[in-house]
């Protein structure tokens, strides 16, 4: 956007800012209802309800997050991933790889679980209780409470604020399991687990002692139910690292290599094979190719990449997307 065109927007932005200020000051925030759309997630093989909020509500989301970001980031642990800058699937994968390969004696036993219907299960009253304890600014509490009350139930998938609230809420469980669970032997404190990683509501605990990891998992489950009013899915697993890979974030992580999850591999393979050797690739497939490529780039997949000539296909896909972006600007 040219400087002249940008300057024309300044009076409008100034007017909107004043209106928002008055709404907050007078406790009269008015927002249109969130529209919900059901979308199928092919990777998870489930239908997700995505909330699409008004532009005005999105502005309030950014106001709330920017004002509270320092507090959110102080609470959210380093090994809580998803929906945070530079802390996505690759970050989580690399952390687990480092743990199981540099010090496998501390990762002999794995507990893996995920929270049952996490987003819709977050109690509005309960999360407000935590926020009230951590935020002392009454205006900010009013804004966040108002935004939370617009959600049909729990938190809202698709909301910028909800991404931070989700990680913030689970941070209490993370700190509990990593800092509060230990045994004392001969006057020395020994943590029940050595490592923990939360990929949003997917949870993994790693330790050297089966009994200790099992106890930590049980106490974590009790904490979630009592303090966060959440439950784990009954499909949670406790297993030795040498018996199977850690299947998480789209990867299968072994103690000696990492591969792509079978379902993702099959979906990606269809797209790669369909476009192998093509000079013209559709825009839809181009986006898929770039999306899937990351999984193969960071796994034990060099032979496969060479077999399907993925580097050449990727180059064409990037050109297609680049040309599409330029055409929109023009």
Predicted regions and their residues:
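Reverse-transcriptase-like RNA-dependent polymerase core
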Residues: 20-45, 59, 135-150
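Conserved pre-motif C helix in the palm subdomain of viral-like polymerases
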Residues: 45-77, 152-180
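Right-hand nucleic-acid polymerase module
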Residues: 53, 58, 62, 68, ...
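Beta-rich nucleic-acid/ligand-interaction surfaces
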Residues: 83-92, 195-196, 204, 238-243
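Non-catalytic, polymerase-adjacent accessory regions of viral genome-replication enzymes
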Residues: 1-22, 330
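Active-site-proximal segment of RNA-dependent polymerases
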Residues: 61-123
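Conserved polymerase palm-domain catalytic core
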Residues: 23, 97-200, 204-221, 239-240
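Inter-domain linker/hinge segments that demarcate the starts of reverse transcriptase
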Residues: 16-26, 216-228
């Amino acid at each position: 956007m040219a400087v002249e065109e940008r300057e024309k927007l300044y009076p409008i932005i100034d007017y909107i800012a004043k209106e928002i200020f008055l709404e907050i000051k007078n406790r009269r925030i008015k927002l249109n209802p969130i529209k919900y759309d059901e979308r199928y997630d092919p990777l998870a093989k489930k239908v997700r309800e995505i909330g699409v909020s008004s532009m005005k509500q999105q502005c309030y989301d950014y106001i709330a997050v920017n004002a509270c970001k320092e507090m959110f980031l102080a609470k959210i642990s380093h090994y809580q991933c998803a929906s945070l800058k530079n802390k996505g699937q690759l970050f989580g994968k690399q952390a687990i790889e480092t743990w199981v390969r540099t010090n496998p004696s501390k990762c002999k036993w794995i507990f893996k679980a995920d929270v049952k219907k996490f987003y819709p299960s977050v109690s509005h009253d309960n999360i407000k209780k935590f926020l009230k304890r951590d935020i002392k600014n009454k205006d900010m509490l009013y804004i966040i409470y108002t935004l939370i009350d617009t959600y049909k139930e729990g938190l809202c998938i698709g909301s910028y604020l909800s991404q931070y609230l989700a990680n913030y809420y689970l941070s209490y469980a993370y700190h509990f399991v990593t800092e509060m669970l230990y045994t004392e032997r001969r006057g020395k404190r020994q943590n029940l687990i050595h490592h923990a990683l939360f990929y949003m509501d997917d949870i993994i605990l790693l330790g050297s002692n089966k009994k200790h990891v099992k106890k930590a998992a049980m106490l974590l489950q009790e904490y979630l139910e009592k303090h966060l009013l959440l439950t784990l899915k009954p499909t949670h697993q406790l297993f030795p690292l040498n018996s199977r890979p850690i299947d998480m974030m789209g990867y299968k992580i072994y103690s000696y290599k990492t591969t792509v999850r079978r379902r993702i591999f099959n979906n990606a393979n269809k797209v790669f094979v369909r476009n192998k050797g093509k000079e013209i690739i559709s825009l839809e497939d181009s986006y898929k190719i770039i999306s899937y490529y990351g999984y193969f780039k960071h796994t034990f997949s060099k032979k496969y990449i060479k077999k399907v000539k993925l580097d050449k296909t990727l180059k064409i896909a990037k050109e297609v997307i680049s040309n599409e972006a330029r055409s929109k600007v023009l």
